[in-house]
A protein has these predicted regions:
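Non-catalytic, C-terminal membrane-associated alpha-helical segments of glycosyltransferases
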Residues: 219-226, 233, 237-301
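A conserved acidic beta->alpha catalytic loop
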Residues: 23, 37-48, 92
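Short, flexible, basic/aromatic active-site loop/helix in glycosyltransferases
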Residues: 116-117, 131-148, 163
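Acidic donor-binding loop at a coil-to-helix junction in glycosyltransferase catalytic cores
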Residues: 175-186
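A recurrent flexible, glycine/aromatic-enriched loop bordering the glycosyltransferase active site
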Residues: 139-157, 175-177
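Active-site nucleotide-sugar/metal-binding loop of Leloir-type enzymes
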Residues: 69-84
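Short, acidic, metal-binding catalytic loop of nucleotide-sugar glycosyltransferases
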Residues: 22-32
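Conserved donor NDP-sugar-binding/catalytic core segment of glycosyltransferases
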Residues: 97-128
């Protein structure tokens, strides 16, 4: 039994996992907290880090490949008496006061879901257009505002609410493409969850140099569009999704031209219409963007 279970899915990033665990040490001091690490590497690359941690880490291996499978194994660690489940990613570090901020916001707003900002720290030699255009960095809101797109990178969930829904699971058809957390929290919203933003509950992530480039940002945008397109297809026909995708591309191109003409350069908000539209059309054709596929693991779909 604990007030909080912090669930961390990891895969072959022991150094980053160690940084995260160290950042959690002052946060959990004096609080009733369990920490569960689910290693999606069958050989257990995170085991030594967890055993060496000053924290009492519950470490398990989920050999089935895929981020959704690891997240579901994290759900399996929940006990009947746990009150809140908190998701953080293995490549993040929590800011001092993070846990207290989540706790205070949940109490103040009586929310079922509380999420906070993820601050992306670009490498020093990252191209200037990335930060100037708002790429990679996520939006922030005022504390108390609705949380529009919770994810497993910095989110608290009231477990009694999950129990009232008979404990929904992460959709493993999204394991290799990503997006299982988007689908999970969208289902909670559709079920009536009260989702609130807490701007003080900050985590940081260092952006690897190999991601600070146009090719990765473009592919990530299409992948995110592909995921949202697959979810949209559950409610709308393929022709409607294709037409909506084409409309988004057209709007995004026009908005990007406007941004450039006005001297703002390429802006992430405008470019996202283009990549999302491409992703929607790809989803309508049955194409998956398997960002998390592993060389020996085929992608179905």
């Amino acid at each position: 039994m604990a007030d909080f279970l912090i669930s961390i899915a990891t895969y072959k990033r022991p150094d980053l996992l160690a940084d995260l665990l160290r950042s959690l040490e002052p946060e959990v001091a004096g609080k009733d907290v369990r920490i569960g690490v689910v290693d999606n590497h069958a050989e257990g690359s995170g085991r030594e880090v967890c055993e060496a941690s000053a924290l009492d880490v519950e470490y398990v291996v989920e050999p089935r490949p895929g981020i959704a499978a690891a997240r579901n194994r994290g759900l399996d660690l929940v006990t009947d008496d746990d009150r809140f489940l908190i998701f953080v990613d293995d490549d993040e570090r929590v800011q001092p006061g993070w846990l207290q901020s989540l706790e205070d916001a949940q109490r103040q707003y009586d929310a079922d879901v509380i999420s906070g900002p993820v601050i992306s720290v670009l490498p020093p030699d990252a191209p200037a257009w990335i930060s100037r255009g708002g790429f990679i960095q996520r939006a922030r809101f005022r504390t108390g505002d609705p949380s529009l797109s919770p994810a497993t990178n910095n989110t608290l969930v009231r477990l009694d609410y999950l129990r009232s829904l008979r404990f929904p699971r992460f959709d493993e058809s999204f394991s290799m493409t990503g997006g299982s957390d988007t689908a999970f929290f969208r289902a909670l919203r559709d079920a009536g969850a009260r989702m609130v933003w807490c701007d003080e509950a900050v985590v940081h992530e260092d952006v690897p140099a190999e991601r600070a480039n146009l090719a990765w940002i473009w592919r990530r945008g299409i992948r995110e569009g592909n995921v949202s397109g697959r979810m949209l297809l559950r409610r709308q026909s393929r022709p409607k999704v294709v037409l909506a995708g084409l409309a988004r591309i057209a709007y995004g191109v026009a908005a990007t031209i406007r941004d450039v003409v006005l001297g703002r350069g390429v802006q992430a908000r405008s470019a996202a219409y283009i990549t999302r539209g491409i992703g929607w059309i790809g989803a309508s054709r049955g194409r998956l963007v398997a960002e998390y596929a592993r060389p020996t693991e085929p992608v179905e779909g």
